[in-house]
């Protein structure tokens, strides 16, 4: 839902294209900040498990609120959460791969990760069209639900580096 359908929803709410561009620029800037500045520190402090859980919580908050408002002020406060929902989750996933996948299979692991996330994104984008047609902007609440479901999956599915010996 978040890319194309956010633009469609915000445009339908009367938000100017230039403002929508600023909102997305804000999200991308937050992503860069997380990738290069705060993400590594969060990953070091909380481990892959905690980082993935934080991403799930941030997504639940972001999409719960985005599903019920098109206030530019509110959206501008929410958009930086993209840094946590995308960049921090990606960093946590890469850390998990580094922990679990042998070095000689790192390329294969990354290819499987990219293929899986790409296929899932494609399927959810197709589903998003149907949901948006039926529910409009409230369809973003499904994204919040997916993030809420991801929280226990992140907590129990992501092992920290210190837990690696328990997995082998």
Ranges and model annotations:
Residues 17-18, 101-113:
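Loop-to-transmembrane helix entry/capping segments in MFS-fold secondary transporters
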Residues 130-149:
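A membrane-interface helix-boundary motif in multi-pass transporters
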